[in-house]
Curated annotation (Swiss-Prot):
Coiled coil: none annotated. Keywords: Chemotaxis, Crown gall tumor, Periplasm, Signal. GO terms for cellular component: outer membrane-bounded periplasmic space. It comes from Agrobacterium fabrum (strain C58 / ATCC 33970). Required for effective transcriptional induction of the vir genes by monosaccharides in response to plant signals and for normal growth and chemotaxis towards certain sugars. Functions as a periplasmic multiple sugar-binding receptor protein. It does not interact with a transport system. This is Multiple sugar-binding periplasmic receptor ChvE. Induction: By L-arabinose, D-galactose, D-fucose in the presence of GbpR (galactose-binding protein regulator). It is found in: Periplasm. Residues 1-25 form the signal peptide. One of its GO terms (molecular function) is carbohydrate binding. Belongs to the bacterial solute-binding protein 2 family. The gene is chvE. GO terms for biological process: chemotaxis.
Length: 354
């Protein structure tokens, strides 16, 4: 009798475990293609999207491509072959996906570009992101405010770093920052001693911290043996950490030679700790929980045959079409407000930042 009861229990458990995936499959499957695990923010993004989609009853397929373009193409092709209903894609190179997205479009699969615009494709349905131009504005404003340029102080030496040239967002970040910095450069209140300006000269392929650190090393040895750096525009926290390491390597970070004002983005833990320690000056917080929520709302609408909510239908032209977008607001974070924004807001626990 005991064995029969055990068998019945096992069958019941088996039926229950089968029922959950069957329910999720009935609601639809969503493929999520993320670029890399080398940045903490993409891990958080992936986890947030999966959590919210599964809570909404969807089956998910989350893949990370290790910043390898052929790998990401293969992953997306597999998702299309498996018959996902929606693709959520944070591309490595937004110009390389046209062919695979054409396959997706032919099968009626909707495509949501996640935080990185996918270019040269008419099969991108929607775009969920932050106001990327404003990100750059906030980065540059944190620098100009700290230097006191509005109060007439200066001149100061600044060097510029851009993001990856294959990431459309990098140009928005840079253009936003330069909308603030260029008037001061033109007036001589900010001096780029290297003369290196423009994304073709200051871009950092794949957002690689080691590349940024090596470039900062070169700038210091070539242009600053008899001068000091007062500020560095950095578009991403990972680059900021590499830049600061380079600066500390030649003596910055002491009472006699303080670190320059260094910006950042993504509020990654090492950079928030650096801000608290008085090294990196600022970062830009982009709440990936909210971005995931917007994305899930888009998925829900698409699955129900409705038009998702968007708030921008003019800005993001991808070479083929203007992609309907939902833009979230970024927030500048410094030592003065990190606790209010990041800890009180529930994004981090205080002990994570110690």
């Amino acid at each position: 009798m005991k064995s029969i009861i055990s068998l019945m229990a096992a069958c019941a458990i088996g039926a229950a475990s089968f029922a959950a995936p069957a329910f999720a499959q009935d609601k639809g499957s969503v493929g999520i293609a993320m670029p890399t695990k080398s940045s903490a923010r993409w891990i958080d993004d992936g986890n947030n999207i999966v959590k919210q989609l599964q809570e909404a009853g969807y089956k998910t397929d989350l893949q990370y491509a290790d910043d390898d373009i052929p790998n990401q193409l293969s992953q997306i092709e597999n998702m299309v072959t498996k018959g996902v209903k929606v693709l959520v894609i944070a591309s490595i190179d937004g110009t390389t996906l046209s062919d695979v997205l054409k396959q997706a479009g032919e099968q009626g699969i909707k495509v949501i570009a996640y935080d990185r615009l996918i270019r040269n494709s008419g099969d991108v349905s929607y775009y969920a992101t932050f106001d990327n131009f404003q990100v750059g504005v906030l980065q540059a404003t944190s620098i100009t405010d700290k230097l006191g340029l509005k109060d007439g102080k200066g001149p100061f030496n600044i060097e510029l770093f851009g993001g990856s040239p294959d990431d459309n967002n990098a140009f928005f970040f840079y253009d936003g920052a330069m909308s603030v910095l260029k008037p001061y450069i033109d007036s001589g209140k900010l001096v780029v001693k290297s003369g290196q300006m423009g994304m073709d000269k200051v871009g950092t392929l794949r957002w690689d911290p080691a590349t940024a650190q090596a470039r900062m090393d070169n700038l210091l040895s070539a242009y600053y043996t008899d001068a000091k750096v007062d500020a560095v525009l950095s578009p991403y926290d990972g680059l900021s950490i590499g830049i600061i390491s380079s600066l500390k390597g030649v003596g910055y970070g002491t009472k006699d030679q303080p670190l320059p004002v260094v910006s950042g983005q993504d509020a990654e833990v090492p950079s928030v700790k650096s801000i608290i320690a008085g090294e990196q000056y600022s970062t830009i917080f982009k709440d990936t929980r909210e971005l995931a929520k917007v994305t899930v709302n888009m998925v829900n609408a698409v699955m129900e045959g409705k038009e998702p909510e968007v708030n921008d239908t003019k800005t993001y032209e991808n070479g083929v079409k203007v992609v309907p977008s939902y833009l979230l607001k970024p927030v500048a974070v410094t030592k003065e407000n990190y606790k209010q924004v990041l800890v009180d807001g529930g994004y981090y626990k205080e002990d994570q930042l110690k």
